[in-house]
Amino acid sequence: MSDLKCPFSGHTGAVTPAGNTNNGDWWPNQINLGILHQHHPASNPLGDAFDYPTAFASLDYSALKADLQTLMTDSQDWWPADWGHYGALFIRLAWHSAGTYRTGDGRGGAGHGNQRFAPLNSWPDNTNLDKARRLLWPIKRKYGNAISWADLIILSGNVALESMGFRTFGFAGGREDIWQPEEDVFWGKETGWLKDERRNDKGELNQPLAAVEMGLIYVNPEGPHGEPDPVASGRDVRETFARMGMTVEETVALVAGGHTFGKCHGAAPDSHLEAEPEGAALHEQGLGWRNTYESGKGEHTITSGIEGAWKPNPTRWDQGYFQMMFTYEWELTKSPAGAWQWTAKDVKPEHMIPDAHVAGKSSAPIMTTADLSLRHDAIMEPVARRFHLDQEAFADAFARAWFKLTHRDLGPRALYLGPDVPEEVQIWQDPVPPVTHPLIDEAEISTLKQQILASGQSVSALVAAAWGSASTFRGSDRRGGANGGRIRLLPQRTWEVNDPEQLNGVLTALETIQSQFNSSSSNGKSVSIADLIVLGGCAAVEKAAADGGHTVVVPFRPGRSDAGPEQTDTASFNVLKPLADGFRNWQRSGLPLRAEELLVDRAQLLTLSAPEMTVLLAGLRVMGANTAGNRQGVFTQNVGVLSNDFCVNLLDMTTRWTPTSEAQDAYIGRDSATGAERWSASRADLVFGSNSQLRAIVEVYAQNDGGSRFVADFVKAWVKVMELDRFDLRS
């Protein structure tokens, strides 16, 4: 039997398909284009016609919340609730779903229900959250597709808080589920759980990571690398929460608010835990961490390894967390599982905490090292003291921070669904003013395009400005984009990648055109700079195509508005500043990643396919949209003309490419017969001739019949990028 091979995988015996070598094993430096095509519609069992906002509108929202409220105290024998209340479990479920978000690239977070899949469903920090999702299954089954898993997980956390006496800030639905693991998220290079190989020479976390160890949401609760040092832990806490966009006040509120409820579980060493869900046996049916200690549940539960509750009344909202923290001195102890924790000394009888499962048993309050960082960190301690003395301020701060935590990656308010959406607008939502005037029509659009082209700005400058405005969009957290016209504001106006001097010329010309149009309009119509920036790019593309012999009309839909400085958090928008933009052949110096990897990463954030990435880069090159007039990759003698010259000349076998340095990040292309220099290129250019998949796409456009297809496909991809943030057009 050992000689028999599976006809599909080629494997013998019991070897798993994962043991098969793939292209990445043979050629580890090969770029991963698969991230551009993940979440293909074919993977979605709901089909292309399913519209989640429509389905959500049919939801009996009040009934759903009532069922969740009932669930909170409906303790199940197979996984008993602590103190008869599941509230803390569902707070942790929601928190750990949202808490993977990081501002560096907008990835992670609660927006897609990715906690259902590897690796998150099997992270050590998510131990036993598989049980929480199974507890939710009867409710998910009842309401079906009217509520996504992603929304249900977050809503369960909100209802949990409300069921224990806390008033939340609100809830918005709109998170659509994915149906396979995300391949684009870099969680770290470590090959073992709870390892830390993610810091630079200064000890700072490498970008875009926001957790201190592989498999953790934030910090090690026992302290950095398991060392119980509250001061050092404070630095980790502040850094990790800042990496997900939280202020110090929000950080303190979240830690204290979340730990107002429930307990830690460390009844015995984790050697009693069997494999996590992804590694568990088939018959476990997706459940992991089977516990062989005693009953394996209830008072015998093992999760973090820390054991105990933070305060009396663990199922009620109150000031107990801060009261315990600042009332008592804390003694370093070890849990039954061997984890470092801190136990209150000389506890008053009224502060002893009844056991979650065993009648007549009680324990002193505990704190983790991370908890005590709120008391010992010089920056967080004053905030914690203030919250201790002002319950109203603490409650308000926690409500707002919880809403921000659980909604940060949902996108703009235009995507919010449901009756509990708060009316108050938050600056972290990147608000744009509503459009309150009639929009320009086709005739006016045509006139404005003529005026823009006659303004003295080149095709290259107009295209670059429009691209710089729209390409800040990130499909990960739906931030950025052209709406709001923030490229005219700080910080974007001064970003090196946007070629500030050239950009200022474009903006000045467009502002003059805007002023003339708006002041002369007799029908109440106005046009925003945000619209004019995009329209200028569209007009330039039309001219570039016409100069190449192709008559095209680039679709343009007005309706963008101009945000002001008061609606723009400069620090928050600085995280959108690209490390590299291969589409403009620009890269910050000193980056460890190769230009082609950064290009694919940026294309994925722009939700582009490999063909879309190819045609856009090739078109932008020949139109001269590189930053600061960089000539790398401009494989044409007719700069400013939209043509397939990049593709044709890249595949020219009479050009011989050689690197110009040992780093092999820049190249010269010479005539193979004469040695005369023809072109210069970056890695982001030559990858389209080197990578077999990208070369196959380039060949389509370089063919004699590929010119018209190239222009048509460029226009289609261009419009897609210009409208990535136009969620108002889809509602």
From Swiss-Prot:
One of its GO terms (molecular function) is catalase activity. Binds 1 heme b (iron(II)-protoporphyrin IX) group per dimer. There is a cross-link at residues 218-244 (Tryptophyl-tyrosyl-methioninium (Tyr-Met) (with W-95)). Heme b binds at residue 259. It catalyses: H2O2 + AH2 = A + 2 H2O; 2 H2O2 = O2 + 2 H2O. There is a cross-link at residues 95-218 (Tryptophyl-tyrosyl-methioninium (Trp-Tyr) (with M-244)). Transmembrane segments: none annotated. Its cofactor is heme b. Residues 1-23 are annotated as: Disordered. GO terms for cellular component: cytosol. InterPro entries: Catalase_peroxidase (IPR000763), Haem_peroxidase (IPR002016), Haem_peroxidase_sf (IPR010255), Peroxidases_AS (IPR019794), Peroxidases_heam-ligand_BS (IPR019793). Belongs to the peroxidase family. Peroxidase/catalase subfamily. Homodimer or homotetramer. PANTHER family: CATALASE-PEROXIDASE, HYDROPEROXIDASE I, BIFUNCTIONAL CATALASE-PEROXIDASE. This is Catalase-peroxidase.
